[in-house]
Design a protein with these regions (language model features):
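A general structural signal for stabilizing positions within well-ordered secondary structure
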Residues: 2, 128, 152-153
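N-terminal helical cap/lid subdomain that shapes the substrate entry/recognition surface
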Residues: 4-120, 131
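Generic leucine side-chain signal with a strong bias for well-ordered alpha-helical environments
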Residues: 12-15, 126, 154, 188
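A cross-family signal for key residues in well-ordered alpha-helices
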Residues: 31, 127, 182
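Short, flexible active-site-adjacent loop segments at beta-strand->alpha-helix junctions, enriched
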Residues: 122, 142
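Surface-exposed amphipathic alpha-helices with a cationic face
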Residues: 123-131, 185
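Substrate-recognition "cap/lid" segment bordering the active-site pocket of phosphatases
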Residues: 134-135, 143-192
Length: 192
């Protein structure tokens, strides 16, 4: 299949798993968070420990969602719930946002220790689209989007960035809802 880029006015790309190979870092951070937390709960309640499943749980409950929504959805799958808390909750708080902060700490460590690279074919495509004059946006629920795009040297390619900070600020629904992509299209003045 060949794409005729001249037929498009813009390119909107997800970050994790499309531009950069960060999905594995996110998955590992989620696993560490939930395995640690579930072990704590199992010890406290004297119930069996069932680990977070990277294949099923990651894809179904947390992939691409804002952290607090991923925590909520995964815990609900285990018939558990926590108070939402607030975005300012620290990682020591047993709230949806607090557990989200723990996941963020695990992700930051993995990012520092292993780094991140961009997919070469995606980089070629992005440069081609930019050379053709297309407007460009990066869309991600990650709060580290700007840092990651800068690390891989691609920040100058994008006219617009809608990331986890903007999703929180604008109270947009996380994926699979299209809200963040629609916001990027609006900012680019492009009809989706």
């Amino acid at each position: 299949m060949r794409l005729n880029l001249k037929e498009f006015g813009a390119v909107l790309c997800d970050l994790d798993g499309v531009i950069t190979q960060t999905a594995r870092l996110h998955a590992a951070a989620w696993k560490r968070l939930f395995d640690d937390y579930l072990q704590e709960v199992a010890a406290r309640t004297r119930s069996p420990f069932k680990p977070f499943d990277l294949e099923e749980d990651y894809r179904v409950y947390v992939d691409g969602k804002p952290r607090h929504e991923g925590v909520r959805d995964f815990l609900a799958s285990r018939k558990m719930s926590l108070p939402p808390g607030t975005p300012s909750d620290g990682s020591d708080r047993e709230t949806l946002y607090g557990l989200g902060q723990r996941k963020d700490k695990h992700f930051k460590v993995a990012l520092r220790e292993t780094g991140v690279i961009a997919y070469p074919n995606t980089v070629k495509f992005l440069h081609l689209a930019r050379a053709m004059g297309l407007k460009m946006a990066v869309v991600s629920s990650s709060h580290h989007c700007a840092e990651i795009i800068e690390t891989v040297g691609l920040s100058s390619l994008f006219d617009v960035r809608v990331d986890g900070h903007e999703i929180d600020r604008l109270q947009l629904a996380g994926k699979p809802a299209p809200d963040s992509f629609l916001e990027a299209a609006r900012r680019l003045a492009i009809e989706p």
